[in-house]
């Protein structure tokens, strides 16, 4: 028996299914343990199975726990289903019994009509059961009904059904009672005195509600139609209280179901029935009483008491009125108000307003518990934001195991933890948002029509700058490298109608995505230029997406229509596929066919642009008393003038001498110039101006804000610089630690270090964004330094120390830097078109990639005879089936489709001669290196590994 257990085999896939893990994981583990298995269908012995279960013990425990939880859940569900089924059966039986109780008397009477006569049962209510004091209590009790529990359950469960069939059943019973052959003695009811102040009500009274129908019983040949509860309805015993609570509970459960029936039609029906039911009856003498009506009718069940000494209209209450009153009572118990639709609407509106008020209050409370803080804030700053003392913050840090001082910077995780300890939620913002300057609201009298800001977008060489050149009547294209605009330019022009328009010329190629996005943020209208002899390019679609995301209207200009190969209709079709449907085709985008070289359609294009601007009603604040602000469009470093930035004014007037802050730098306006270099005294809204007076180079997209004094501007800039400096320091330290950990874990990653120097800040950002995209898991670009201006000796020394290359974009090194670079044998490259930079860097990174290995099949051989050679081993006599085998080929030995060897050929012979290759159709002899288990019928596959150059 023990031998059979040891010899028992287990399939890997079955073991994986039992452990609820991937069969590939089990197969990989078996291979690591030295098991000789080929696939998940392979078999393993008992020892290997125990090793597998030991390795995947956690998974086994999880599977067992999951199965236990699932079984327990199934048992609970089964128990609940059984209880629900039993409850449902009881309720169904009770409903059937109660339903038969209301229907069976009539059926029974029909069957027994020839034998047992119908008897009308009249019950007299004693005077002591109904008194004036009890009648007063009726007004105070919502539902003073004393019914047996099964009857109340039937009323609660079958309220709707009873309401619909009550009138018909009672009518049938009334007819049957009236047609009785046997005379029944009628006992007059005594008149019940009632107080004069008690009004006549349409709702069913206590006596009416005391009547209940039960299962019919034949007593002495008589059919009992109804019974009257003779117990006092005003009993204050515990049993009465318990029944009252149960009744209210049942009514509450049915309230939601009955609400759907409370509509205006019920109200109209009740009003109509009341109008038709109230009839004038003759007054009766005081000694007489009303004739008793059969049990089961509404009149006998709950007759309203009469007022003495007065003749008054008494409504003849019918079944519809009773049903409506019952529903109204139940509705009142559920606090649903009246049944009118107007009352319901007011009630719902009140509930909605209360919910909205609660939600707004909760939102305000949640906002009060959110602290907006910059990363690396100090305990003192954090304490001011949360309304606590710095001492409390430091003590909390000590309790958390962090020893800090009052001015020490805290990292992001520490700030979140401390805020959570004080009941706040930390929301991190940038240093500019934290120190944002409050802008005064614009006064309506200061708002005037301003010139529109137009951005020209499109693909490379589609004619954007040529269009602007024709409008400005100056040759701007001649100064651009390869006809490609290298950085954003802002220009103000005056068209024929003496109206001013500000143009932003953005680069069209993909590398300047961020610059184009900034152009879309400050622009009012976009002119999308597409060449008629080309097609809609990816950069064109990208420009469309930027404009749509910014909510900027688009005017399409189809350029180069003067060329013979121009096809404007094709461009319109492609634009419609991109979501831009022109007006000619029923869309909302204006379109104009132009020729920027010959000036065809330019005037019409300007008219459409101005018409779009008039529709938008573009206005700006032209007040000279407010502090102006604008957007930094572009910045550059001039050798003689220093930092020069192109600013697009948004509100107010920029004047010479104004102190300002822009991003992390500040300054004082020393000079203002237009795009042609002419000095001006001030600049208003939508006017581009070149500003001199910056202390440092600002970044494109920063907001320039005029401050009240130099001191305020300097303080604000210093606060931003401290936060930015701390952020950069922490980030560089974290990057170094992360890189060390990554290199230890994954091995050394190949990096191409470089230093970038360019003429403008926008060009640097575009280059950095483009270069950082060229990377994968093995190689990447590491920019160790970037700056504006010429290449200096410091840049060369940094490149030599970090083994980096230097890229100069439209800048050159000085004399000393050039000599030092030649001495250090550094690679310094100069470019004027950004495409060339990206292409060269991509090629360099591809060269750093390890080659990709591919297997190339050469041929296959079949072993037809095996020879035993002394001192060599087994040699296979093979027949070349296909392809070709070489002496240095790698081979794979297959037996019955299963690979059992993968290695190198040791010898390749034809007859007794060693050969280098054997073609198909020839016989040869082979021997395998370090392997001689060759059998007849084996297949030998020959292949080789080919290295292929990889691409990013």
From Swiss-Prot:
Q: Name one GO molecular function term.
A: GTP binding
Region ranges (G2): 483-487
Function (record text): One of the essential components for the initiation of protein synthesis. Protects formylmethionyl-tRNA from spontaneous hydrolysis and promotes its binding to the 30S ribosomal subunits. Also involved in the hydrolysis of GTP during the formation of the 70S ribosomal complex.
Task: Please list where the region (G3) is annotated.
Answer: 505-508
According to the lineage, what is the superkingdom?
Bacteria
Could you say which residues bind GTP here?
A: 458-465, 505-509, 559-562
Region annotation Disordered: where it falls in the sequence: 74-95, 153-204, 230-256, 273-319
Q: Where in the cell is it found?
A: Cytoplasm
HAMAP family recorded? IF_2_B
**Stated family:** Belongs to the TRAFAC class translation factor GTPase superfamily. Classic translation factor GTPase family. IF-2 subfamily.
Q: Which PROSITE patterns match?
A: G_TR_2, IF2
Q: Name the Pfam families on file.
A: EF-G_D2, GTP_EFTU, IF-2, IF2_N
Q: Which gene encodes it?
A: infB
Designated name of the protein = Translation initiation factor IF-2
Keyword terms, alphabetized: Cytoplasm, GTP-binding, Initiation factor, Nucleotide-binding, Protein biosynthesis
Region annotated G4 sits at 559-562
Q: Where is the composition biased (Basic and acidic residues)?
A: 232-242
Task: From the UniProt entry, list the residue stretches annotated as the region G5.
Answer: 595-597
Provide a GO CC annotation, any one. Answer: cytoplasm
Organism this protein belongs to: Chlorobium limicola (strain DSM 245 / NBRC 103803 / 6330)
> Region labeled G1 — which residues?
458-465
Broad class of where this protein is predominantly found = cytoplasm
